[in-house]
């Protein structure tokens, strides 16, 4: 099972917000997911982004692949840097 960390669209028409979820890559965008690990609201100023860092690092170490947008969001919070440091420190 290929697992992805991606955005699940929520909200109403023209007022989206997103949950950051861990889901099977074959499931639909707004369909079934394994675990919700945060949320992202691009309409607020400043942008509202809340992430469960421990769960995200755990899923990344298990092999979950973030989508391009989620990778950028994780990078802005420094989570990708922590993941790379932990990954290459073991070797």
Curated annotation (Swiss-Prot):
Organism the protein comes from: Lacticaseibacillus paracasei (strain ATCC 334 / BCRC 17002 / CCUG 31169 / CIP 107868 / KCTC 3260 / NRRL B-441) (Lactobacillus paracasei)
GO cellular-component term (any): cytoplasm
Stated name of the protein: Small ribosomal subunit protein bS16
Biological processes annotated in GO: translation
PANTHER family in the record: 30S RIBOSOMAL PROTEIN S16, SMALL RIBOSOMAL SUBUNIT PROTEIN BS16M
Keyword match Lipid biosynthesis: no
Highest taxon in the source lineage: Bacteria
Pfam families: Ribosomal_S16
Family: Belongs to the bacterial ribosomal protein bS16 family.
Gene that this sequence comes from: rpsP
Alphabetized UniProt keyword annotations: Ribonucleoprotein, Ribosomal protein
GO molecular function: structural constituent of ribosome
């Amino acid at each position: 099972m290929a697992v992805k960390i991606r955005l699940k669209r929520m909200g109403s028409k023209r007022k989206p917000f997103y949950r950051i979820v861990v889901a099977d890559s074959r499931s639909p965008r707004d369909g079934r997911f394994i675990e919700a690990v945060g949320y992202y609201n691009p309409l607020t100023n400043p942008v509202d982004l809340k992430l469960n860092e421990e769960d995200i690092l755990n899923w990344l170490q298990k092999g979950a692949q973030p989508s391009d947008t989620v990778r950028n969001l994780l990078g802005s919070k420094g989570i990708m840097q922590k993941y790379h440091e932990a990954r290459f420190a073991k070797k």
